[in-house]
Amino acid sequence: MKKKRFNSDIEVQAFARHICMSAHKMRRVIDQIRGRSYEQTLMILELMPYRASYPIFRLIYSAAANASKTMGSKEADSLISKAEVNEGTFIKKLKPRARGRSYPIKKPTCHIIIVLKDKSKKPKSFLERKYGFVDKYMIGK
C-alpha cells in the first residue's frame, strides 16, 4: 500500500480514534462539511441535530488550534481539504440473560481524519522543502 504524501507547509492533520459510534452515522455528517471553510463548518455542526456532530466539532476545533500553533496561520483562512471516516474495532460486551446464559453485544467504533488546508499560503516546491531555499542555479535554464 502506498503512503499518501502530506504537505506539512500548508496542511495540518487531526485524528480521533475509537469513537463509540458507527462509521455510517459519522459519514452522514462528514459528507456535509467536506470542502467547506472553517467558519462555515462550525456553524453547520452547531446546528446539526445529530449526535455525531459533537466529536467532529471538537476535532475540527483541535485541528484549527494545531494550524494556528504550528504554522501561525489564522483559523478563518482554513479549508477542510480532507475528511475521512474509517471503521474501527468492535467493543465486545456480554449481556446477562435468563438461566445463566449471556448474549454478546458488539458496539462499533470509528476513526476520523481531518486535514485542514491554509487558503492563503502557497505550497513550497521540492527544492524549497529539501534545502530550505531555491537558488537560480538549482533550477537550471
Swiss-Prot record:
Compartment(s) where it occurs, according to its Swiss-Prot or TrEMBL record: Plastid, Chloroplast
GO molecular function: rRNA binding; structural constituent of ribosome
InterPro entries: Ribosomal_uL22, Ribosomal_uL22_bac/chlpt-type, Ribosomal_uL22_bac/org-type, Ribosomal_uL22_CS, Ribosomal_uL22_sf
Annotated GO CC locations: chloroplast; large ribosomal subunit
Entry keywords, A to Z: Chloroplast, Plastid, Ribonucleoprotein, Ribosomal protein, RNA-binding, rRNA-binding
Swiss-Prot/TrEMBL GO biological process terms: translation
Pfam families, A to Z: Ribosomal_L22
Predominant subcellular localization, coarse grouping: plastid
Cross-referenced PROSITE patterns: RIBOSOMAL_L22
Function: This protein binds specifically to 23S rRNA. The globular domain of the protein is located near the polypeptide exit tunnel on the outside of the subunit, while an extended beta-hairpin is found that lines the wall of the exit tunnel in the center of the 70S ribosome.
Record text on subunit structure and interactions: Part of the 50S ribosomal subunit.
Cited PANTHER family: CHLOROPLAST 50S RIBOSOMAL PROTEIN L22-RELATED, LARGE RIBOSOMAL SUBUNIT PROTEIN UL22M
Family designation: Belongs to the universal ribosomal protein uL22 family.
Record's protein name: Large ribosomal subunit protein uL22c
Name of encoding gene: rpl22
